[in-house]
From Swiss-Prot:
The keyword Zinc-finger applies. This is Large ribosomal subunit protein eL43. The keyword Ribosomal protein applies. A zinc finger (C4-type) spans 39-60. One of its GO terms (biological process) is translation. GO terms for molecular function: structural constituent of ribosome; zinc ion binding. It comes from Gossypium hirsutum.
Amino acid sequence: MTKRTKKAGIVGKYGTRYGASLRKQIKKMEVSQHSKYFCEFCGKYAVKRKAVGIWGCKACGKVKAGGAYTLNTASAVTVRSTIRRLREQTES
């Protein structure tokens, strides 16, 4: 393992290189891409990133397409809520 500090966290491996603001941006992306997410199918926190945009649940084995660094992108959440709203309007 590479040397890390409490403040730098996952980007401690970069040391003093690349500048503080770029390391902060990278830290946000790397923390989100390495964390576990909630599976909509089985209800467990077991979804992890397999590759860029491919997310798989270790509990139930489902594979889902998502964002590069997060499971759900902001635009996908907006589209999903819009579809749900339109579906409710047509049903009533």
